């Protein structure tokens, strides 16, 4: 007689404790009060947006009007890809009429998107990069979404969202969704870093790894060396050091989430420094580097601008950029040492 119980236990979807994202968030918050349930519900909506984007990406090459550019530019002066626009609209759609967030701010919008009917009760703001690394979409390489949740402070009657211009320690939660061989969601609410994999058979993000911890040192450095001659001497000296010393290897995909995920899991350093012409760098603080810095430090790593802790940096406007160094403590401190040495030489110390 067939053992149906054994068939069930051998099911691929049931080969581990199926801890879902919403259950895990509530466990981490150790509460079932209204605030905890709000954060859990927001995370569920973010997960829904990730599922919708992942579905679109999986069929992008088979559908018309998905790949390529829209012909428009965003507030950053960058050409907008169709997937950028689609993913941005997805995040807005899943939070409309949710009662959970009052504002959404993203790379694709000059000003925050307000949901007035949510504002009396949804005292949260979602900041996000809907598709990071969108240049990879057309060639079927990894891309991701980055998100940060902040508590709204004050009434924001002027609609200028000035309360968002605070340091990264003010984040309530942050994370990213990586669209790769599997779709993975990584998040932290200040109690460690945890990863979830989307199980297509269940339609749920299932806990894959809890309390991810980075090694203090890693062999990987991730940087766009095509910018070598645009960097300050300190960064060029650091790269030359990497080239001269054995035990280091370069990995760079052009997708921040993919490169950062490798560093998070294996150790090493990701850097996107400023250039001589643009010392502020390329990456935006509030919805790109601050959320990732939050994750890195929660996992035991270090996040820096090169001259100060990245999470201490206070922006003066919504889309402010900052030089970025993220990774294992020893690797980040090595980069910082080159910058500090250059500063000492400049002042003659």
From Swiss-Prot:
Pathway: Carbohydrate biosynthesis; Calvin cycle. Its EC number is 3.1.3.11. NCBIfam families: PRK09293.1-1. It is found in: Cytoplasm. PANTHER family: FRUCTOSE-1,6-BISPHOSPHATASE-RELATED, SEDOHEPTULOSE-1,7-BISPHOSPHATASE, CHLOROPLASTIC. Its cofactor is Mg(2+). It comes from the Bacteria. This is Fructose-1,6-bisphosphatase class 1. It comes from Picosynechococcus sp. (strain ATCC 27264 / PCC 7002 / PR-6). Substrate binds at residues 132-135, 224, 252, 282. Belongs to the FBPase class 1 family. It catalyses: beta-D-fructose 1,6-bisphosphate + H2O = beta-D-fructose 6-phosphate + phosphate. SUPFAM superfamilies: Carbohydrate phosphatase. Binds 2 magnesium ions per subunit.
């Amino acid at each position: 007689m067939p053992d149906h119980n054994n068939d069930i236990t051998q099911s691929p979807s049931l080969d581990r404790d199926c801890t879902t994202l919403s259950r895990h968030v509530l466990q981490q918050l150790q509460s079932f009060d209204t605030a905890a349930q709000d954060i859990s519900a927001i995370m569920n909506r973010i997960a829904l947006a990730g599922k919708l984007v992942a579905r679109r990406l999986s069929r992008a090459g088979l559908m018309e009007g998905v790949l390529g550019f829209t012909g428009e530019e965003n507030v950053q002066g960058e050409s907008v890809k169709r997937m950028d626009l689609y993913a941005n609209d997805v995040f807005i759609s899943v939070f409309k009429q949710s009662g959970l967030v009052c504002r959404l701010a993203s790379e694709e919008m000059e000003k925050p998107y307000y949901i007035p009917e949510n504002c009396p009760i949804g005292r949260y703001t979602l900041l996000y990069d809907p598709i990071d690394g969108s240049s990879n979409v057309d060639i079927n390489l990894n891309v991701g979404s980055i998100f940060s949740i902040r508590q709204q402070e004050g009434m924001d009657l002027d609609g200028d969202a000035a309360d968002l211009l605070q340091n990264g320690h003010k984040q309530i939660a942050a994370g990213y969704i990586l669209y790769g061989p599997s779709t993975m969601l990584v998040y932290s609410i200040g109690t460690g870093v945890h990863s979830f994999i989307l199980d297509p058979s269940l339609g749920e993000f299932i806990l894959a790894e809890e309390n991810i911890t980075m090694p203090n040192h890693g062999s990987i450095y991730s940087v766009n060396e095509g910018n070598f001659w645009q960097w300050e001497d300190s960064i060029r000296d650091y790269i030359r050091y990497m080239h001269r010393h054995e035990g280091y290897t370069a990995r760079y995909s052009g997708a921040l989430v993919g490169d950062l995920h490798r560093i998070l899991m294996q150790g090493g350093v990701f850097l996107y420094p400023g250039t001589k012409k643009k010392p502020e760098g390329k990456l935006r603080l509030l919805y790109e580097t601050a959320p990732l810095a939050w994750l890195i430090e929660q996992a035991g790593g270090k996040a820096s601008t090169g001259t100060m802790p990245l999470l201490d940096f206070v922006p003066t406007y919504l889309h402010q950029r900052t030089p970025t160094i993220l990774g294992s403590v020893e690797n980040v401190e090595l980069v910082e040492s080159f910058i500090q040495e250059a500063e000492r030489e400049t002042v003659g110390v």
